[in-house]
Amino acid sequence: MRYLFIPIILAVLASCGSDLEPQTATPLNGQQLADKYLIVDTHIDVPFRLHRQPQDVGVATDSGEFDYPRAVAGGLNAPFMSIYIPAQVEEDGGAKALADELIDLVEGIIRQHPDKFAAAHSTAQIDANFKAGLISLPMGMENGGPIQGDLNNVSYFFDRGI
């Protein structure tokens, strides 16, 4: 009985061959893929970086890992701006104020460079900005310190674009 399965397995394997022609289309290269598809980075620490060292990320910068020219070169369409609050600031009671300042910095980038960046509070806005050739700057809060134990602050930060 055991030897009966060997011819059956061989017959099944032989029937698994493909008569398809080899693919003749040239595959897309990295740049073509970046131009065609939306690329999202879910964590960019630019707001806190700018809080510590103000600079214009709409042009090439010498420090940090994000600026407009590098985003364009890498095909980055939607870098989530991380509203990061260090634990010490939370302990000192200044978390909400710092979060507001960091959100203001992101909004300032958009105001300063409306030809390069746009706000994005939904996937539809990210898609529309992509089609318009703008880099979306959605925001995400890295920790809950700015909520300060008050659930009303969840709505407050939602209204601010988080």
Indicate where each model-derived feature is located.
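Bacterial N-terminal signal peptides
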Residues: 5-14
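N-terminal hydrophobic targeting/anchoring segments and the immediately downstream early-domain regions
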Residues: 16-162
